[in-house]
A protein has these predicted regions:
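A short, Lys/Arg-rich alpha-helix, primarily the initiator
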Residues: 1-24
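Short, charged recognition helix plus adjacent turn
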Residues: 1-8, 73-101
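The alpha-helix within a helix-turn-helix
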Residues: 21, 33, 61
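Short alpha-helical DNA-recognition segment
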Residues: 25-45
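Short coil turns linking two alpha-helices in DNA-binding domains
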Residues: 39-42, 53, 67
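DNA major-groove recognition helix of helix-turn-helix/homeodomain DNA-binding modules
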Residues: 55-71
Length: 101
């Protein structure tokens, strides 16, 4: 994750948390947070790209049975894909200027 935008990383982290929750069979963030002893409002914020503490991040990793490294590998893939899609949507003249630098 070189030259990453912190807000984009948080948004991708939130999206990843949402996917992991749904993969566990929880359609509702409220039910998931209740079942896993998480603050409902805080969990909603994390899924929506707001800051999360390391303590809570580690708790979520334990809930999903993945390591922080595995979690951030998923987030990094999303960030890389997002960057590539962003480049595809830029006008050709902007891309030529970027290559010239």
């Amino acid at each position: 994750m070189n030259n990453t935008n912190p807000q984009s990383v948080l948004i991708n982290l939130g999206s990843t948390l949402r996917q992991l929750r749904m993969r566990k069979g929880f359609k509702s963030a409220e039910v998931f947070s209740y079942e896993n002893d998480l603050n409902r409002t805080a969990y909603w914020r994390w899924e929506n790209g707001q800051n999360i503490t390391m303590k809570n991040l580690l708790k979520l990793c334990n809930i999903h049975k993945i390591s922080p490294k595995e979690l951030f590998e998923i987030v990094d893939k999303k960030y890389s894909l997002e960057s590539k899609i962003g480049l595809m949507n830029e006008p050709e003249s902007v891309l030529i200027k970027k290559k010239a630098k």
